[in-house]
Amino acid sequence: WIGLVGSEMCIRDSSITADRYFYIVGRFLLGLYFLLPGLAKVFLFQDNWDVVVLREVPFPTFSLSLVAIAQIFFGTMLMVGKYVYMGALVLAVVTLLINFYIHDFWNMAEDANQAHETQNFVKNLGIFAGLLVLSKRSTQT
């Protein structure tokens, strides 16, 4: 009986350890998901600015700069485990704004580009959901 209790404890402890590792790896990958595009916005500013102007995003230079800063800063913070709650919520808002301004498939002709933007839109909804879960989880650790 004691051995069984001891075995359960080991299983429970390893489950907690695995949960912690999954949280850290998931948080790191979500951070990387935002850091890399943020850096791309800086180093390929003109290309990204052209897209932002084409999609009629308000205040294109300011908006693009702000999104790049948010993605770089909060993406990095997610990766290192700082400001996770705030970072996840800010990046969730950024993700929704990108979805509605950049991946607006409903404003496109029915072709391969529309299908691609629909896929990006749905993918971003999954990222948005992950950020919401991360924000909740970060308040519990």
Language model segments and positions:
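Single conserved hydrophobic/aromatic residue that forms the stacking wall/gate
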Residues: W1-D13
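Membrane-interface extramembranous regions
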Residues: R12-F73, V80-T141
